From Swiss-Prot:
Keyword Zinc: yes
Pfam families listed in its UniProt record: Beta-Casp, CPSF73-100_C, Lactamase_B_6, RMMBL
Residues that hold Zn(2+) 2 according to the record: D82, H83, D186, H425
Native species: Schizosaccharomyces pombe (strain 972 / ATCC 24843)
Protein name: Endoribonuclease ysh1
Biological process, per Gene Ontology: co-transcriptional mRNA 3'-end processing, cleavage and polyadenylation pathway
Binding site for Zn(2+) 1: H78, H80, H165, D186
């Protein structure tokens, strides 16, 4: 029989068994997404975007750090610029010779989107990454694929699945030489008005490459989010203001337009307020959305059966900003979403000084962009011409970015169940928080799940053995395993052959024999064995006691680790070497080496010093009673503050017209008002209850003989506390003040140690 061989971390790794992953972009950042996977001589590139905060060559991924001629397949997840805008540069300006794939909607939108990117790029000809000619040449080589269809290229298989981010967005399930990899791209697990949620592939991947855009943040539920969005817009309009919503030309803008169009339809008072979509590109691409309705969810299909939902009833296209009649309230969705330039930046500079207006940020804001800067609500902003403009308009953030939050990401990671998780597409802080959260979550799992956050241009190596045939022999092969059964034994490799057998069969089926390794370690030890026994019991619960042939005490921890005092100040530990015993031994050694510095050890072994030290300065003598009174005063002062006054016998507490007095010699409370008296009695008893255990414990001797005492210190302290609290309450039972005064002269303080014991 045979079984797939799993990777052994302790085994030597052949370089050919290492999967290499490298970020050329989007490593500890958001922008210029580009990732490369190499394994068994095959290379896959995932996405090729630009960084929205930079221009020209500086916006590109670090293509110079990798030989692009080795790339077999380039897979594009969706049409956003930070994932696709450098694709024509790769295909036309480098030595890339591989094949490029994306879904049909992505290819249709990309043609218009990248053409617009070339036109509006705010750079000179010398810094332009590519021109229209390069774009057309590149698109002739791009191949479109359908969801759920498996394509094989040069031994590499990949299947696209719905990602739920924008129309056409997909995640890729890639198979390379027996290793399964899932790349999510940007994805969403929250169903909206027109897109499918991200799918969970039917096969389990070995490696998951997932976004970390929002780290450990949590999104509002969709309905609450929509309600807040509409409330902000409606409130701004009622105040006579304008609403600016910077958006990407395509993607989430269509979702927002669907929400606004429906809201305007249900509110007659808003129909006179115009909604504008300021993007000529979006107008051109709207036909694509109308074409690919069959790739959207059931909600939009039902509406489409009656009318085309993307032919909006209350949304107008703003063709020319110069002809825009900017009078009265309005709502404008304008690109670009990062406010770096274009219509959205022009309107921001125009509307920023008016406090009635609102800037509504609905997407993720990348570091280094105006969208990110204005979230800090600065007093002024700098215009594209360099002028300072006062910022009085309100700034609101509400994420409709269709990225997963922590709960959605964590749930998806659990469903996918990969052993290796690589986080990309996230700022360093968010990515670090997500890694820590996942590491804590996976801490107690039986299978070790590893989480990685590689930086740009820093390769990550993951060891994977390819598929191997393993022969099960001897006792291991007696019972035929069923699907899902786990087989255990010793795996023997000789040349390219693998055999699985039990330890008893090694002599029969191999040239190997077995032996037991006994570990022994000697450590310095300056405490007593009784003290060691005490601390080990605290940790492990049960410690077996015995003696050596020489009569030396010997302890056995967890039936695995044996401790013997071999000579003065030297303690020997012995155990049979294995993972569990080694771990227990490490814990035992740590405890033993820390005994001398343990506060418990100091308390248990401390004794009174009964002789004089004439060479030392004598501290001022403070009686035990004075020390108690001092601590008691501190406690009462914290409770009653300025209401308390010190007297000869104790203290006096005044509250409005009532007075209560405490006599420290008897601990009696006198007061004509029962409510105040009860309060003071309660506080006094709590004070004594708090102070006594520590002051008494610090004065008492504790010998090593106490270790075996069945009555714990906690029990003694509890008895003392109970007795004192009862004494105070009994002494302070309600009695006539005259009778109490007559008895005070003969009473002794009831806090003396002799009475307690």
């Amino acid at each position: 029989m045979s079984k797939r061989k799993e990777f052994d971390e302790d085994a030597p790794v052949d370089p050919s068994d290492l999967l290499e992953f490298i970020n050329l972009g989007a490593g500890n950042e958001v922008g210029r997404s580009c990732h490369v996977i190499q394994y068994k001589g095959k290379t896959v590139m995932l996405d090729a975007g630009v960084h929205p905060a930079y221009t020209g060559l500086s916006a590109l991924p670090f293509f110079d750090e990798f030989d692009l001629s080795t790339v077999d397949v380039l897979l594009i997840s969706h049409f956003h610029l930070d994932h696709v805008a450098s694709l024509p540069y790769v295909m036309q300006k480098t030595n890339f010779r591989g094949r490029v794939f994306m879904t049909h909607p992505t290819k249709a939108v990309c043609k218009w989107l990248l053409s617009d990117y070339v036109k509006v790029s705010n750079v000179g000809m010398e810094d332009q990454l590519y021109d229209e000619k390069d774009l057309l040449a590149a698109f002739d080589r791009i191949e479109a694929v359908d969801y759920h269809s498996t394509i094989e290229v040069e031994g590499i298989k990949f299947t696209p699945y719905h990602a739920g981010h924008v129309l056409g967005a997909c995640m890729y399930f890639v198979e390379m030489a027996g290793v399964n990899i899932l790349f999510t791209g940007d994805y969403s697990r929250e169903e909206d008005r027109h897109l499918h949620v991200a799918e969970v592939p039917p096969k389990r991947p070995d490696v998951l490459i997932t976004e970390s855009t929002y780290g450990t943040a949590s999104h509002q539920p969709r309905l609450e989010k929509e309600a807040r969005l509409l409330n902000i817009i409606h409130s701004t309009i009622r105040n006579g203001g304008r609403v600016l919503m910077p958006v990407f030309a395509l993607g989430r803008a269509q979702e927002l337009l669907l929400i606004l169009d429906e809201y305007w339809n249900n509110h007659l008072d808003l129909r006179s307020v115009p909604i504008y979509y300021a993007s000529s590109l979006a107008r051109k691409c709207m036909a694509i959305f109308q074409t690919y309705v069959n790739m959207m969810n059931d909600n939009i299909r039902k509406i489409f059966a009656e009318r085309n939902p993307f032919i909006f009833r209350f949304v107008k296209s703003l063709r020319n900003l110069e002809k825009f009649d900017d009078i009265g309230p309005s709502v404008i969705l304008a690109s670009p979403g990062m406010l770096q330039n274009g219509v959205s930046r022009t309107l921001l500079e125009r509307w920023a000084p008016d406090p009635r207006n609102t800037l509504l940020l609905t997407g993720y804001s990348v570091e280094g962009t105006m969208a990110k800067q204005i979230t800090n609500e600065p007093i002024e902003i700098v215009s594209l011409s360099g002028q300072k403009i006062p910022r009085r308009m309100a700034v609101e953030e509400l994420s409709f970015a269709a990225h997963v939050d922590y709960l959605q990401n964590s749930e998806f990671i659990d469903l996918v169940n990969a052993d290796h998780i690589i986080l990309v597409h996230g700022e360093q802080t968010n990515m670090g928080r997500l890694k820590s959260a996942l590491a804590s979550k996976f801490h107690n799992r039986k299978v070790d799940v590893k989480v990685y956050t590689p930086r740009n241009c820093v390769p990550l190596y993951l060891p994977f053995k390819g598929e191997r045939l393993v022969r099960a022999l001897g006792k291991v092969a007696v019972h035929k395993p069923k699907e899902g059964d786990i087989m255990s034994g010793i795996l023997i490799q000789k040349d390219a052959n693998y055999k699985l057998m039990s330890a008893e069969d090694l002599r029969d089926f191999s040239d190997l024999t077995t032996t037991v390794l006994t570990q022994k370690q000697v450590i310095p030890f300056f405490s007593s064995m009784e003290l060691a026994n005490f601390h080990l019991k605290q940790m492990f619960g049960y410690v077996k006691q015995s003696k050596t042939k020489a009569g030396q005490p010997q302890y056995t921890v967890m039936d695995a680790i044996t401790l013997t005092l071999i000579q003065e100040h030297k303690l020997a530990l012995e155990w049979v070497g294995n993972i569990m015993n080694d771990t227990i031994a490490d814990s035992v050694i740590t405890i033993l080496l820390g005994i001398e510095s343990s506060p418990a050890s100091v308390k248990l072994t401390s004794h009174k010093c009964n002789h004089l030290h004439s060479h030392l300065d004598k501290p001022p003598k403070v009686s035990k009673e004075e020390d108690r009174i001092k601590k008691l005063m501190m406690f009462l002062d914290n409770q009653f503050g300025e209401s308390m006054t010190k007297t000869e016998k104790g203290v006096e507490i005044k509250f409005e017209k009532y007075e209560a007095s405490i006599d420290f010699s008897t601990m009696k409370v006198e007061c004509s008002n029962e409510a105040l008296r009860s309060r003071v009695v309660h506080v006094l008893s709590r004070a004594i209850n708090t102070i006594l255990p520590f002051s008494e414990a610090s004065q008492n001797d504790v010998s090593e003989d106490d270790f075996e005492n069945e009555e714990s210190d906690d029990d003694k302290i509890f008895e003392q506390q109970t007795k004192i609290e009862d004494d105070v309450k009994n002494e302070n039972k309600t009695e006539p003040v005259e009778e109490q005064k007559s008895e005070e002269k003969n009473e002794q303080p009831n806090l003396k140690k002799e009475e307690l014991s």
